[in-house]
Regions:
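Short S/T/G/P-rich N-terminal loop/turn motif that feeds into the first structured element of a domain
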Residues: 1-41, 52-183
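Acidic/polar, glycine-enriched structural segments that form the non-catalytic walls/loops
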Residues: 48
Length: 183
């Protein structure tokens, strides 16, 4: 599980939310099993519970996540910078968007730890199905992130006529590892 702290986030995110907690499951069956067990458990708790300090309200979203670029190895950092873009597909297929994301390490450099494509399945504001994707790149270190941003600004690319996507201004996050399990 990752707690995402917004550092410089586009849109109205910071007006509405303080942070995001992201849970990753290998399948919907695994998610249903674990979330059902979590909701069914009984008993007390000592100290604060999440609901004592945070309210999710109607904002829960369930996304499909495709790991376009697996981990570059080594231990997962406790805090890692990440960048995210939300893009309109404008006719580009979801499978092509996922395939394109596999090249992100070539574009951003070797310090990209992981890259994935996010597509909303349930919740959040209404929108046409498979019309948008999010791209997220997580870096091994702050220095690696800085090198990637320098690479982007030093190598501005012209629009690709074969890629109809349009993307919003990116967002910068600090990803805090709060739990990891290899299941």
């Amino acid at each position: 599980a990752i707690l995402r702290e917004p550092l410089a986030v586009s849109g109205d995110f910071q007006n509405d939310w303080d942070f995001v907690v992201a849970f990753y499951y290998p399948s919907y069956a695994d998610m249903v099993e674990k979330r059902t067990a979590f909701r069914s458990r009984t008993g007390g708790a000592e100290g604060y519970r999440l609901r004592d300090v945070a309210d999710c309200g109607d904002r829960i979203r369930i996304n499909n996540v495709w790991f376009a670029l697996e981990s570059s190895g080594g231990p997962i950092p406790e805090v890692a910078p990440s960048m995210a873009l939300n893009c309109e597909l404008n006719g580009l297929s979801l499978s092509r968007a996922i395939s394109n994301a596999g090249n992100i390490r070539n574009f951003l450099g070797s310090e990209v730890r992981q890259a994935f494509v996010i597509n909303r399945m349930f919740g959040g504001p209404s929108m046409p199905q498979n019309s948008q994707v999010g791209y997220r790149a997580i870096f091994n270190s702050s220095d690696g992130f800085a090198e990637a941003v320098d690479r982007i600004t030093d190598n501005i690319q012209p629009p690709n006529p074969d890629n109809p996507q349009t993307c919003n201004v990116g967002s910068l996050w600090a990803d805090h590892l709060i739990f990891a399990r290899d299941n």
